[in-house]
Amino acid sequence: MICDAEELSALDRKLSGVYRAATKKATNQHPPVLKAEQRGWIKRRNECRKSGDKRNCLSGAYLRRIAELQARYRLVPGKGPFRYRCDGNLANEVVATFFQTDPPRLIAERGDSVSLMYLQPSGSGTKYQGRNESFWEHHGEALITWGYGAAPLHCKKAQ
C-alpha cells in the first residue's frame, strides 16, 4: 500500500532521510536504542493493515515517527529550553523545549526523566500530552502532570 500511494511513498522517503540523520547523532548510544525503537515502530506501523482506514493510520504513524526523531535527536531547531518552577519550590523544576515538527512536539525534562509529548487540541492555552505526562500552558503558567495518576504541578515560567 505504501508504494501505491504517492503521499505514503513521500512520507516513507522522508522518514528514511530523517532516520539516517538520527543514526548519525546516535552513534554513541549503548545499547543501540534507535535501531531497536525503529524495529518496534515498524511492527506498530504494520498493525495499520488491521485498521478500517489504512491510509490515515499509516500517514499518522509516519508523521508521528518523523516528528519524534526530529525532536529527540534535535534535527530541527527547538525553541527554548524554558524553565518552569513548580509549586513554589526552586528545586521542583521542569525544563521544556518546543519543536515545530508536524505534529508539534515538546521535550520536557524533570529530574532524571524525559517525556516526549505531542500538541493536543485545547480550548485555551497550549496543551501537550505524553505517555503519562501532560503540559498545559496558559499565560506563562503551566499545569504539569508527571506520571500516571500523579497530582498536577502548578508551575510558572522562570525569568
Model-found features: residue ranges?
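N-terminal alpha-helical modules
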Residues: M1-Q159
